[in-house]
């Protein structure tokens, strides 16, 4: 394992290394550490790593291993079934981009609503890029819409960029159909943030609303309630999605 770890980007995940006195027995934290590390090493692709680094320029390229998403998804399915999966989920912050991707895929498989919310809230503060965010599904919140809506309302008030983006995503994914209420538009309009990815999500929300709630969304667009950038971007995305 030591030789394999040397292939990872410099400075990545001392969490993988066996510590003095630890035994790599099944069910212990060290076992899942080494298994995740071995998986990343064996599936690393330098060319893909360079591609990812260009695609996600706001994160340190040294934290990207270069493992493709289908491989991560496949590995995460097995990871989620392990008795020691909680050891991996608790090891925040992770040292690599790929660990964050795995984390998103693992918690997406949680079916207990309260546990899922707990894992989402534990992980969201460590989400720092659009690619990891896009893998963090909110569909598991659908069985309990009242509680999901209350959480979305609270997350909108967060100081953290991707927590706010996730809240808007919940409103977009779960509350633009039969559960829609016009007041939700006011919630999203009321989000005033400088971050590009928050404002892009606001625009995406209204683009989806134009398709799913056309009368209500068109009235908001026509009213001038949106800032100019979000107004124009929402219309652009709506046109592109036709």
Which residues make up each language-model segment?
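Alpha-helical scaffold domains
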Residues: 26-242
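N-terminal amphipathic/hydrophobic targeting modules at extreme N-termini
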Residues: 5-7
């Amino acid at each position: 394992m030591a030789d394999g770890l040397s292939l990872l980007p410099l400075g990545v995940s001392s969490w993988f290394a066996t510590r003095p006195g630890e035994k790599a027995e099944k069910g212990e934290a060290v076992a899942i550490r080494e298994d995740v590390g071995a998986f990343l090493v064996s599936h690393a692709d330098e060319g893909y790593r360079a591609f990812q680094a260009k695609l996600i320029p706001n994160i340190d390229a040294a934290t990207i291993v270069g493992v493709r998403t289908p491989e991560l998804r496949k590995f995460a399915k097995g990871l989620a079934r392990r008795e020691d999966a909680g050891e991996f989920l608790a090891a925040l912050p992770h040292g690599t981009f790929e660990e964050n991707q795995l984390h998103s895929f693992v918690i997406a498989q949680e079916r207990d609503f309260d546990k899922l919310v707990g894992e989402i809230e534990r992980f969201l503060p460590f989400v720092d890029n659009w690619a990891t965010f896009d893998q963090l599904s909110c569909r598991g919140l659908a069985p309990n819409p009242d509680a999901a809506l209350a959480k979305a309302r609270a997350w909108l008030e967060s100081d953290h960029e991707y927590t706010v983006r996730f809240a808007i995503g919940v409103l977009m994914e779960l509350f633009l159909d039969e559960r829609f209420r016009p007041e939700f538009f006011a919630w999203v309009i009321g989000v005033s943030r400088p971050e590009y990815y928050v404002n892009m999500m606001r625009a995406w929300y209204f683009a989806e609303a134009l398709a799913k709630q056309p009368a209500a969304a068109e009235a908001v667009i026509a009213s001038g309630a949106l800032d100019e950038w979000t107004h124009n971007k929402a219309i652009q995305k709506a046109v592109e999605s036709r």
